[in-house]
A protein has these predicted regions:
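A polyanion-binding, active-site-adjacent surface
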Residues: 37-198, 205-208, 213-222, 226-231, ...
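Polybasic, low-complexity association/targeting segments
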Residues: 2-15, 21-61
């Protein structure tokens, strides 16, 4: 049985009415309008221009043409991690473009958080390597049943892709359509407004964003991407998760429980 791939997922234990706008597959501008006030304020300089209008027209047009565009809740990461809660930023590239089967229904792998997948979806290889590194750093079993990272997001880990939508089965299909300017603006605004954050930049794509952080009081951690193609070139053994917590504690912020599900 295949699920309706255009139907938005409702988060577990959600109030049926409280997050209706956040989880609807609505026009892109409507999803922005439903963001928490703090994010709308930070994003205000990034939106309202011709390039944003063109991006909205593109994404909305792809959906209107019947193309499955993932994720449904484009700004799920921003709903789970308000700007005044952010302590760590992990940058991804673009959303997963595949699907998984949960309870006999086909659903998107992407659900609006970089590297994360919904409960029940098979843990992708890059995320398995992330869990492996955490296990090595903390002396814990690296295998987790779920690849859902919402628990991290609720602790203040912003799991942000630099491109926020993708067509099913077509990796990087929404790259160079305007998302990069939006997320660059968001990263810069966040770095200017929040002190002593940790930015984890894995792989050359994420590391290209380092220029947005120069001269600002943040901890910037760089390593190869956790993909199986590059993880053994320095991601595994990088020590980033302990380094992040050491930085946070030195600056009077609570550590992240990386072992939490």
């Amino acid at each position: 049985m295949q699920a309706d791939l255009f139907a938005a997922e409702s988060p577990p234990n959600a109030n049926p009415g409280a997050n209706a706008n956040a989880n609807a597959v609505g026009p892109l501008q409507a999803q922005v309008d439903a963001l928490p006030a703090g994010w709308r304020e930070l994003l205000q300089p990034c939106l309202g221009n011709a390039s944003w209008a063109a991006l909205c027209d593109f994404v909305d047009g792809e959906r209107a043409a019947g193309k499955p565009v993932f994720p449904h809740a484009v700004f799920h990461a921003l709903h789970l991690t308000p700007p005044d809660s952010v302590r760590v930023v992990i940058l991804g590239q673009d959303p997963y473009h595949g699907t998984g089967v949960v309870g006999g229904a086909e659903i998107p792998q992407a659900h609006g958080l970089a590297f994360s997948v919904p409960d029940g979806v098979k843990v992708p290889p890059s995320l398995r390597n992330i869990f492996k590194e955490i296990g090595a750093e903390y002396g814990a079993e690296p295998v987790r049943a779920s690849g859902n990272l919402e628990g991290w997001a609720r602790q203040g880990v912003l799991l942000l892709n630099t491109v926020l939508t993708v067509e099913q089965g077509n990796a990087a299909s929404h790259a160079r359509r305007g998302w990069e300017a939006v997320t660059d603006c968001l990263i810069h605004a966040l770095a200017m407004s929040r002190p002593n954050l940790v930015f984890m930049l894995w792989g050359s794509h994420a590391q290209a964003k380092k220029a947005l952080l120069e001269g600002k009081p943040h901890c910037v951690l760089e390593a190869p991407h956790p993909s199986p193609l590059s993880a053994h070139r320095g991601f595994l053994g990088c020590g980033h998760f302990r380094q992040a917590n050491d930085w946070l504690e030195r600056h009077g912020k609570p550590a992240i429980d990386w072992l939490a599900s």
